[in-house]
Amino acid sequence: MSRFFKSAAFPILIVVVLAFFAQRLINPGDSGPRYDYSTFQQDLSEGNVKSAVVKTKGNLLEVTLKSPANQKHEVGYVPDNGNTLVGQLERERVAFDIEGTKSNGWLSLLTYVLPFLIFIGFWIFLMNQVQGGGSKVMSFGKSRARRLSVDSPKITFRDVAGADEAVEELHEIKEFLENPKKFQALGARIPKGVLLYGPPGTGKTLLARAVAGEAGVPFFSISGSDFVEMFVGVGASRVRDLFEQAKQNAPCIIFMDEIDAVGRHRGAGMGGGHDEREQTLNQLLVEMDGFEAKDNIIMIAATNRPDILDPALLRPGRFDRQVTVDRPDRKGRSKILEVHTRGKPLAREIDIDALAGQTPGFTGADLANLVNEAALLAARTGKREITQVELEEGIMRVIAGPEKKTRVMSSEERRITAYHEMGHALVGHFLEHADPVHKISVIGRGQALGYTISMPQEDKFLTTRAALGDTMAMTLGGRAAEEIIFGEITTGASNDLEKVTGTAKQMVMRFGMSEKLGPRVFGHDQSQPFLGREFSSQADYSDEIAREIDDEIRRIVETAHQSAKDILTEHRESLVYISEILIKRETIEKDQFEALVDGRTEEEVFGAEASPPPDVPLPPATERGRDTPRPLPRPGLAGGAAEMHFPERPELA
């Protein structure tokens, strides 16, 4: 019901109802049967008229009848017939009176004024609606910045973990706002702007909120997209209004989230030099450069895309200081987990540092989601504390999504998936530079039918050519296992091939790791599709070089593929034995996998109650019947195994 009162239909309904009552007030309808002039003449001739009032204004005759007693009627008459009417009344000896211009003045005034008053009232109502808030029509030129209330819950630097360098830089901002004379005495000038940049989920907005909670000065928060509208000049007007508010409340802080929405490199796109976004950027440049030292206004901005920002925005005098907020290392992840587990009941055996080691590449948002998922799982099962089981399942949910235990797979597809995943695991296990295998499963998660997770033992910032080669070989281990065991390949390796081809292309064209082509970069980096500085780029190499690049990419991929096949051919017995165990057990953990590879039996690894898997001989590929072709999976998804890729996170092969 509240939605109806706020909708546009409500004022329209009010106007219709008021107009109806006004019409009824001005022209009230008669009740009873119609009384016409001929009926009046009949009553007059029969002597049934008791009295009459002749109203010259409106040409109406008010008649009072004898029977029914004192019943009154109004009837119109022709003005030219007035004298004749009066004569008839005199002849019939009817008492009558004549009313001239006398009338109800208030009613006449209301007749003319009421419609106008209704229109004025409706117009005022509309104006109040469109001017009521920052998002209304008549407020286009006003800034949409939200001022942080003093009474709102505060976030301090104590709530920020894993970004010590960024906290140190921003802590200096707080000190300047609290005690500017300390810096001015040494002739220091505080940075007018601080740009926070880094991957999504690393805590850039959280840092800005912490500054707001610590500084104790007015804090204005706005998004870059709030400046851009379809109307010309709105963005520039909002920028001016924002800085006017800031100057009136100095010292203060302005925080602009996702500044790349308005600060993109000028000249990009199809808008030309008079693009509305560019006019907004020009006004922002003028306002930032127009600061005076006494204003004590500091602007903090956050973005995931510093590479597309206009150089004029990043020059000294505007954003003097640029702070990188990167993914936390193991120590940082441990501190972040301590923050997010604060106040949550954890089991005694949980080791936060060990948990941080299991989450390489996780951002602060990922870790917060991990802990929340674990808490939800514990509550779902009726536990009173969060155990290691829920935390490990939370890691898997963040990486690959929830389990799909109800997904129905045929026995043939399940067998192919198991051998595919075991191919990844065995190749990764026997290669020196591949990341250790952490978990293997044929239980689907998300859109994948199975997965193999490999985790680095420590955070890595550089990768060698040998490590890239081993990683590609491990990625192709699933396809190699299908070829060796089944003599056939499936669509499950489609994403494997995509990842391997991309890595080989980077090695040749970006990293200079091709012995034939040498240390040289070819072409432009296409990994940033939103740069927008150029719609198309031309290759800076000849067709002959392009052919050599293709040959090198093919050679690198085939080398990795052959390496995977050689390893699996040598360890074919382990591939068959452990894959059959995986089909039966569905999931094999790291320690169990390593024990099985070392030659231990299933009973020794899983317990005495386990029986060895049945020895089911695999028929040659030429003797197996072919099933009816099935629809191909969507591009990039696994057809027979999990081929999910999360950059900077544990590898799923």
UniProtKB/Swiss-Prot annotation:
Q: Which residues form the active site?
A: 421
Classification lineage: Bacteria, Bacillati, Actinomycetota, Thermoleophilia, Solirubrobacterales
GO CC: one term? plasma membrane
Cytoplasmic compartment spans: 1-7, 127-653
Q: What is its EC number?
A: 3.4.24.-
Determine if Metal-binding is one of this entry's keywords: yes
Alphabetized UniProt keyword annotations: ATP-binding, Cell membrane, Hydrolase, Membrane, Metal-binding, Metalloprotease, Nucleotide-binding, Protease, Transmembrane, Transmembrane helix, Zinc
Entry cofactors: Zn(2+)
Gene Ontology molecular function, alphabetical: ATP binding; ATP hydrolysis activity; ATP-dependent peptidase activity; metalloendopeptidase activity; zinc ion binding
What does this gene product do?
Acts as a processive, ATP-dependent zinc metallopeptidase for both cytoplasmic and membrane proteins. Plays a role in the quality control of integral membrane proteins.
Identify its protein family: In the central section; belongs to the AAA ATPase family.
- How is the protein disposed in the membrane? Multi-pass membrane protein
Task: Show which residues sit on the Extracellular side of the membrane.
Answer: 29-105
**Location of the protein in the cell:** Cell membrane
What is the annotated quaternary arrangement, including any partners? Homohexamer.
Segments traversing the membrane: 8-28, 106-126
What PROSITE patterns does the record tag this protein with? Answer: AAA
Listed Pro residues bias regions: 611-620
Q: Which ranges form a coiled coil? A: none
The GO annotation for biological process reads: protein catabolic process; proteolysis
A Pfam family this protein belongs to?
Answer: FtsH_ext
Task: From the Swiss-Prot or TrEMBL record, give the protein name.
Answer: ATP-dependent zinc metalloprotease FtsH 1
